[in-house]
């Protein structure tokens, strides 16, 4: 430990030295402590043992108390909500072995490997792509074309830089790669469509035989055109309509070219077409072309989302690869300040509106003090919000609304005075003044605030002054004077006939004023107005206001244009149709007019021609409009742009263009936008290499290339599409063509119709769906619980048909051959054994028709495969297996005296009698099948059979139950492929008094199964048979023969004659045929379980009880419960007689109670059964019931 002396002991220099030494020691000691702590921490981390997560030496043994079942039940969890079940001693009962709730899993659907595209491709052409060398090769075009093959591309290029060339090249190569797919070029207007047809056919050389033009929605052979062509030029509205009507398959479209893509906003048809195609396929390419994508980031992102754009290619006029290909374009600005006359008018207007502005300020509507700063758009926005506000009272709301409307009108007047001049202001203000004055005088308006404004002294003075100035001033605004000076200089320097000028302005009144001013110059200037199709807005009719229209009053006839009205004045009033627009443009190109004064109609898309000078009379805050205007010049030769500014126009223009350039730069870098994922159509193994070659233009395209008229281009292209039938002036007669039915297209790999959830899930560990299991359960339920024989027969037929379809052809041929042999042998025996009665048939009847045999296969039921029976088994066990034939047991079919047993797959038994021949009074032979009831088969002597006699129609009769002691043997063919010398035989009894043909219209006796008998609990005795023996009894009941069954089991109730009801339903058939009973007494044929109504009997014997649970209990899934009768539930003990009686109870589920009895019979009471005698008939099973 270091001890420092106090500073007071030291003096002078020693004291200073001590001070510094003490500080040094302090810092050294401090850093030493830090270093020591770091080293210690690292040592602890490196030497500390890591405790494994899985520690075998834990305290889990505490939870493994196996002696406490209640504690174990808590740990394992109890699914039941109630308390644990306990025994009489108080301990917790054992957990039931009944399976818990089934767990289900989703059936895995195999994932289909998606190929790059579903379109058919030409892989040989896919190795290369053609780049036309007909024009100059430009780097930016080359790069954009290659990029368009792999991405949905948005191309933003300045006007005149070859966007159409890029589209044509991409279309040409997609046509080579996807020869049967469709390529669609969409443009918003007909003139643009015509321009693109001319460009694509003259650049890429696409044959006209593959090109179609669709501009008419009413054309009736649209489906034929869509199916026969590959390249289509059309408008988006036409494509949207054809997609919605099912005329064109959306999955067949491989390329979609969109011109003027900046329109893809809102609910425009471009967006609807892309949305519709996306519903069916994403394997198609989009090429979007525009000069100005949007003025802000949100607009660009909206286009990207609507058109699924995955890549953006943007070039500006300052781009490196663009500059050297741009023509020199000089942009000149000129600011024109308002004249003194305009300033005087502005002051008078401000003096008149000041009281209204003060009222608006008091109400909090506007926060302005200078009336000259009133803005039209601002006032309209505030008024819209006020109307939409439900909290403002109605009176105050509409009062504020009219104030803002008046202020907005004044703001528009300011704009017209500052930008367009006095004449434009006069036209607008006079119309508003006349409208209000007329309504005020007619007492239709009570707005005192507006009256105070319009009838005030400043406004009256203003109107008089404007009227005077419009007559004396040569130019209404200094801009017009600057424009005239520019035109003078231009035409002096460009005296050639090819010089062209376009002047852009926003309002029609201003355009007409400019035209009139130019016309007054009387020189070589030839101007004309160029506006849209809509008519001039209908002005307020002062004369007819308030007058009622007379009934039947016709519209006024069109006023003929007076000779003093010029073409531009008439166009300004009536609008310009497309025909007139094309005529003006055609004359402009030819030099008839060399100046066009255009509104916004001339800004976008139109190829007006070579323009040397562009004058922007006004400017807007939209950079897109400004760029479109300036792009009309400098395409093929140098040009000049003159921007005329007034008031605050220049600042707005600079702000808009500066923001647009900023956005363009960030879009080029990929900032601020989120692109969609890429989807390749070309396989990854292919990367097409460029092949630069000169494109040979087909002869049919030369005519399109030489044509300049848009209508003529459309007509020529249409005539080629129709095979030369579409001549000018002729219309095809399509009246006989019917409207095609609408086609509904589905996406790839879609499943139509409804699909249940059960078909898509399965139990864990199962290989079949829940629906398939339910279907099997439903079939078993119908087989067990059905009261109608027809339902069982129908199910048997369906199962037989499914089994027959699954067999191979070789096995079926073998079965048919065996059936042929059997039928021939039966026919031969029948013919040869008749009792002296001739039954002649043609000789060719021995050959069975293959079609009839094949048809009869549907009516054949298959008996489950019997197994070989061991001779070592006891007689009773053999009888038990033969008698109680279930799917789990076997049948011994012996073959005559040889007593040989064979294992066969199935036995074919005809269950359907298709013979509906009418019967006579006599009856023929009857064939009856008798089960083998003993290991020893008695062979009866043969007896000739009498010829079959037809039955009577519709009369029920008793069946003669006295059998013939003699019978013949008929072989039943086996379905196995192995052939054997021995035949599996059945004993057949021929009865001369009966026939095997059923009578038409008479219900045949139906055998009743054990389940039906136990469910009904009828008082009269009934026969209970197994499922396998049921098919034999059904055949026996159809033949309606009877034969006493030999006693094979010592049963005290087996000798009872059984009455089988021929008519299972409870109708009143006996009332119709009263002379004949509806039932027949038939000796029982191999009964299994029988009940009697004797008082001393009421339950099964011990042997029958044992056989019931051995042969009829089948372990099935707990969810597939089958209604089953539990005999124990119905037992009751009589105290006097000390005997058990059988009660009449309903069906219960195949549950644990049945399982308990089954286990009891097999395992639990083996010791007690062993103590008894080995004679099964004398064994006592009542102790099971007692427990």
Curated annotation (Swiss-Prot):
Disulfide bond annotation, renumbered to this chain: none
Q: Where does ATP bind?
A: 157-164
This entry's Gene Ontology molecular function terms read: 3'-5' DNA helicase activity; ATP binding; ATP hydrolysis activity; four-way junction DNA binding; four-way junction helicase activity
Which stretches of sequence are listed as region Disordered?
A: 542-576, 781-848, 941-1003
Q: According to the UniProt entry, which residue ranges have a biased composition of type Low complexity?
A: 967-977
Organism domain of life: Eukaryota
Q: Which CDD domains match?
A: DEXDc_FANCM (cd18033), FANCM_ID (cd12091)
Pfam families attached to this UniProt entry: Helicase_C, ResIII
A GO CC annotation recorded here is: nucleus
Quote the EC number: 3.6.4.12
Q: Where is the composition biased (Polar residues)?
A: 564-576, 822-848
Under catalytic activity, the entry for this protein gives: ATP + H2O = ADP + phosphate + H(+)
Summarize the subunit comment. Interacts with the MHF histone-fold complex to form the FANCM-MHF complex.
Similarity comment: Belongs to the DEAD box helicase family. DEAH subfamily. FANCM sub-subfamily.
* Protein name (record): ATP-dependent DNA helicase MPH1
**Organism whose genome encodes this protein:** Candida albicans (strain SC5314 / ATCC MYA-2876)
